[in-house]
Structure formats: structure tokens, C-alpha cells
From Swiss-Prot:
The keyword Zinc is annotated on this UniProt entry: no
HAMAP family in the record: GTPase_EngB
PROSITE patterns named among the record's database cross-references: G_ENGB
Entry function: Necessary for normal cell division and for the maintenance of normal septation.
Binding residues for Mg(2+): S23, T43
Pfam families per the UniProt record, alphabetical: MMR_HSR1
Gene Ontology MF annotations: GTP binding; metal ion binding
Family: Belongs to the TRAFAC class TrmE-Era-EngA-EngB-Septin-like GTPase superfamily. EngB GTPase family.
Source organism phylogeny: Archaea, Methanobacteriati, Methanobacteriota, Stenosarchaea group, Halobacteria
Positions of GTP binding: 16-23, 41-45, 60-63, 140-143, 175-177
Ranges for domain EngB-type G: 8-195
UniProt-recorded name of the protein: Probable GTP-binding protein EngB
Length: 206
């Protein structure tokens, strides 16, 4: 279903549910306009942004969950393709940025928890870890959240990260992409570039 991936050795991917602001975040990181919209699921194919002279790219993968105006079964197919993409290119993916809606994430996770069910976003977080891809959780739309620390602690807890969230600042990054407030994400991603001794990649998140 997904088209061919550009030939780049290193990559950072943006993953998450529909309508959490992945495309807006991609615009904030790259400084270039990318397709965004109010309807859930605007991005249906991976949106790759590469720098012509560099062996690196940033990829916005389609959101999973509710998509307006698509046939039944397509949503699950998108999720399967996202997982397949990450699995297939895990060796190239330096960081997997899991984008959450800070205001809605806890409710969505709790709604899909219980019994044998694992919420998609939690499943995706664990998948990144299992594949050896460093996860960074970009908690977006924080300008709409009143109880900031409590909300971030709850998100950390749902992901199996013992609160307080502040001790996980290399993993949890509160941001507001629409207002270009992404410094916490840049710091988190760059800390992993540091650990990998890839200072050459820090120019893309600064």
C-alpha cells in the first residue's frame, strides 16, 4: 500500500493516531509546508522530507484510528502498513517520535485498556523499543492542557515509565507544534543523536 521509500541511510519517523498533529510537527521541524487538515487521516501515504545533500530524512507516517471518508477496514490496513514500515526499516530509523494529543491521550489509552486489549499507542511504543528504535513521546497540544505535570505523569505511567515524568525528559517531550514550541522534542532527539555519536544529525532538530 505504501509507495517506495527514498534511499536514505538515516531516518526519524513520526507515528501516532490520526489528528494528533504529526504533519504540523513535521512543518515545525523542517520549516516547510506539508499537507495538514482538520479531517482525521489526511495523510494516507508516508510523507518524506529529505535534504538533498544529506543522507537523512524525516518521515511522517499516516495516522491510525478514525479516518473520515474511508472504507471499513482501511483504518486497520493503515495501522498494519505503519507497523510493517517501522519493522522493515528499523535499522535505518534513529528515533521513532510517537506523537500524542496531550489533552486526549490518557482518556483514549484508558478507553482501550483492559482484558486482552492493548491500546494502539502503547503497543506502538513497545514495538519501537522491541525493534531497537529509540522512542520519544511528543506530547502535543500542551497549550490546551491545564494540569500539565499531572497529565504528563499519567502519560508516563500508562507507558510503563515510573513518574515523575521529569526524569524521562529524553523520552517524554511536551510540545505545542502549532505554535512552534518544540524545544523539548529537539532536546530529546538530540540527546539520542549524542548517544549514537551522530552530532552531524543535530542540525535537523535545532
Amino acid at each position: 500500500m505504501f509507495k517506495d521509500r527514498p534511499d536514505r541511510s538515516d531516518e526519524v519517523v513520526l507515528v501516532g493516531r490520526s489528528n494528533v498533529g504529526k504533519s504540523t510537527l513535521m512543518r515545525a521541524v523542517t520549516g516547510h509546508q506539508v499537507p495538514t487538515g482538520q479531517k482525521p487521516g489526511v495523510t494516507r501515504q508516508p510523507n518524506h522530507f529529505d535534504w538533498a545533500s544529506e543522507d537523512f530524512m524525516l518521515t511522517d507516517l499516516p495516522g491510525f484510528g478514525y479516518m473520515q471518508g474511508v472504507e471499513d477496514g482501511h483504518e486497520e490496513a493503515i495501522k498494519t502498513e505503519v507497523v510493517r514500515y517501522v519493522e522493515s526499516h528499523a535499522d535505518n530509523i534513529m528515533v521513532g517520535v510517537l506523537v500524542l494529543d496531550g489533552k486526549a491521550a490518557v482518556d483514549i489509552i484508558d478507553r482501550h485498556s483492559g482484558g486482552d486489549e492493548i491500546p494502539h499507542v502503547v503497543e506502538l511504543y513497545y514495538l519501537l523499543e522491541e525493534l531497537g528504535v529509540q522512542p520519544v513521546v511528543a506530547v502535543n497540544k500542551m497549550d490546551k492542557v491545564d494540569d500539565r505535570d499531572e497529565r504528563l505523569n499519567d502519560i508516563a505511567d500508562r507507558l510503563g515509565l515510573y513518574p515523575p515524568w521529569e526524569q524521562w525528559q529524553d523520552v517524554i517531550a511536551p510540545i505545542t507544534a502549532k505554535k512552534d514550541r518544540i524545544a523539548a522534542l529537539e532536546d530529546a532527539v538530540n540527546s539520542h543523536f549524542d548517544a549514537a555519536k551522530r552530532d552531524d544529525l543535530k542540525q535537523f532538530f535545532s
